[in-house]
Structures are given as structure tokens and as C-alpha cells.
Amino acid sequence: MFTGIVQGTAPIHSIKEKANFRTQVVKLLPEMRKDLEIGASIANNGVCLTVTEINGDLVSFDLMQETLKITNLGTVKVGDYVNIERAMQMGTEIGGHLLSGHIYCTAKISDIIASENNRQIWFELPSADVMKYILTKGFVAVDGISLTIGEVRDTQFCVNLIPETLQRTLMGRRKVGDIVNIEIDPQTQAIVDTVENYLQSKNF
């Protein structure tokens, strides 16, 4: 499990294509590697990945074809950066909201509105079906970042970002047209699905 509080970004050092999967090697800072062991879980752009090898500051992950297909990790290149969050431990402060690291879909950045002290970013989701889980003032994870939804319109929603989030995460470098990973809030999904199933059972 993760909290959606990204610890920083890290560059892709190398990518090794193999039969039906890819090994992605990321260069992690010392504070990101503390007590790190093979088998540990680390979120890369919000995707829960398992550490397969540690070689100094280089940490390897294996990504299956399904992960490459449904997330933006399938398009990253050597030199690109990813958001990094270590798995939460017992007693960890949950500053965001609980995340599983299982991506629901991707979204495209449709607009970026900059102001003096923050930035509003709009996202276009692939279908209206996803929007039932996107509620104003609700939670959503974008590239592993726990964010509050500011406004919802048709198949779009926006978030408002403070300078700290822009500096610590990839959001400060994102451009219109970029693709981001979306994990919907599991509690919201459970409530919406339960109500929907109940209404269907009553023929509403």
C-alpha cells in the first residue's frame, strides 16, 4: 500500500527489453534506498513494482506486457524521470489517501492554467464510464500523487497544485498532451459500485 505522498523523482538509467516483459533500471537517491531489499514494493508513477535487483544506486524492476500496455511506463525512455514512493510501513503518517498502486486507466493533460502561487491542470479521461468515480472534492491519484479533485466537466476534471507538489513531483514538468496514470479512490469505487448494483437489483 502507498499514501500518495511522492518522495521525489528518479531517472530511468536503462531499459532492457526481454521476451514478454521489460526490465527497467532506476537510479535512486540514498534516502530512497534506505533499508531497501529485493522483493520490496516501490511505486513508479503510481505503479506498484517489485524490486528485482539492487546494484549500488541502481534498482531494477520487471514490468509485464499488461503493465506496459495500460500505464504510461510503456512509453518512458532512458533519461526520463518517474515519481517514486516507497511502500508504507506500520505507523506511517497517511498524508494523502490509501493507494494500491494498481492503475485504473490513463488520462491526457488537456490544459494547464498557471497563476502566481499554484497551477491548475485539466485531464481528459478515455471514457465517460470512468467519470462516475471522479467526484468534486474527492480523491484521485495522478502518477501516484494523492490529489483532491477541484472541478468535473463531462469527461474532464482538474486539480490545483501548490509549489511543493510541482517541485517534488513530475507535475512541475508536465505539458499539455502528456499521458498520466490514474488510480481512482478505492472507497469511492466501492460506494459507487455498491449503489449502482443495488439500484440495478431494484430495476431503477
Curated annotation (Swiss-Prot):
Matching entries from Pfam families are given as:
Lum_binding (PF00677)
Q: Which positions are annotated as binding 2,4-dihydroxypteridine 2?
A: C48, L49, T50, D62, L63, M64, Q65, E66, T67, G101, H102, I103, K137
Return the broad EC class: transferase
User: Gene Ontology terms, cellular component aspect?
Assistant: cytosol
Give its E.C. classification number.
2.5.1.9
Ordered alphabetically, the record's keywords are:
Repeat, Riboflavin biosynthesis, Transferase
Q: What does this protein do?
A: Catalyzes the dismutation of two molecules of 6,7-dimethyl-8-ribityllumazine, resulting in the formation of riboflavin and 5-amino-6-(D-ribitylamino)uracil.
Self-association or partners: how does it assemble? Homotrimer.
Protein name, entry field: Riboflavin synthase
Recorded name of the encoding gene: ribE
